[in-house]
A protein has these predicted regions:
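Sec-exported extracytoplasmic/periplasmic mature domains
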Residues: 44-48, 57, 61-71, 178-182, ...
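Sec-dependent signal peptide recognition
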Residues: 2-7
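C-terminal motif of bacterial Sec signal peptides marking the signal peptidase cleavage site
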Residues: 13-15
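Solvent-exposed, acidic/flexible segments
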Residues: 32, 45, 52-59, 118-125, ...
Length: 331
């Protein structure tokens, strides 16, 4: 009821297009909540498949580890499960001007401005993307398996990710729970990069605790590859930023822009889409841009997670310029 009343108030304060957006947000969140049933109910149900049963039991153990060993919130999140019967829970639409590497901000009354707009319907997401393209923006659509309500509600396990390999399931749960620890308004890169550092440290500790050394080595290798990709994206983004700020003609900028994306696709064609553009770079940067800074902060905290979280909460409440200086944010 709190969700409905809050969002209904928001719709009364917004224009027609915003009313439509919040209406789908209300409906989408309510559908997720209605579909959720306690884990014990699913585990006791004879119709639950052995594969799903095993994953739910694994998720419960991971959830317990998160609170017991990682000092992540101990609450009702991930104590229930919802079968959504679709591949993603939401579709995020990222947009950036044709000659800019900065995101078009999407601003909301309670969460502040973020670097994307999320839709519970792929059709609505694609329609919004087409409108943005018509206005001259670069656009990238990303299907999302999970999201956090920032502790406002008890987030359920979802069919969109429950069958992930166990390491990836743990990674996702640690990431989403981290969003309940600290949240900075108007700073998507801060929030997502922090959650990435928590998820990675969490998975390392989780694997070590079980003596799964082979999987730990594989995870470390995968993270190293991700760092290399993130570095290449950051370099491409930096070069494009300089190109866009230059006095070159739009024709010259467009040519150099195309060359940069050809180069990036040649290096990482397996993960860079054919239609990669400025918005795609934004979608990567928000999850990677500040990771090195948070890793340093964790090291400075001696690996003590509660101390690390306390420092991050202080930063989240501070002026953005102070955060940028400490985390050495790159363009």
């Amino acid at each position: 009821m709190r969700l409905v009343l809050t969002l209904l108030l928001v719709t009364l304060l917004c224009g027609c297009e915003s009313v439509a957006f919040y209406a789908q947000a209300i409906g989408g969140q309510l559908n997720v909540m209605r579909a959720a049933r306690p884990l014990d109910s699913w585990l006791a149900d004879p119709q639950t498949t052995p594969e799903l049963r095993a994953r739910l039991e694994s998720a419960r153990r991971i959830r317990q580890f998160a609170s017991r060993e990682l000092a992540l919130p101990e609450n009702g999140s991930y104590a229930s499960y919802a079968d959504l019967r679709r591949p993603y829970v939401v579709w995020n639409v990222f947009a950036a001007p044709r000659f800019s590497v900065e995101a078009k901000p999407e601003c909301f009354p309670f969460t502040g401005c973020v670097s994307y707009r999320g839709f519970f319907s792929e059709k609505l997401a694609r329609a919004h993307a087409e409108r943005l393209r018509g206005d001259g923006y670069d656009v990238h659509i990303a299907g999302v398996p999970a999201y956090s309500t920032l502790g406002w509600f008890d987030d359920p396990l979802l069919s969109t990710f429950i069958l992930y390999p166990e390491v990836q399931l743990a990674r996702l749960l640690f990431h989403e729970l981290a969003h309940q620890v600290a949240y900075a308004r108007d700073d998507t890169a801060f929030n997502e990069s922090f959650a990435v550092v928590v998820e990675e440290e969490g998975v390392r500790r989780w694997l070590r605790a079980q003596g799964r050394t082979t999987e730990l080595a594989a995870f470390r290798a995968a993270q190293a590859r991700k760092r290399e990709f993130a570095a290449s994206v950051a370099q491409t983004r930096a070069r494009l930023g300089q190109i866009y700020k230059s006095d070159a003609t739009e024709q010259a900028k467009a040519r150099q822009k195309a060359e940069e994306f050809v180069r990036l696709r040649a290096e990482y064609g397996n993960v860079v889409p054919t239609e990669a553009n400025n918005a795609f770079l934004v979608s990567v940067a928000v999850y990677t841009q500040l990771v090195p800074g948070f890793e340093r902060l964790l090291a400075d905290s001696g690996g003590n997670l509660p101390a690390f979280y306390a420092r991050v909460r202080e930063l989240a409440a501070s002026e953005r310029s102070s955060r940028d200086t400490l985390l050495a944010r790159r363009p």
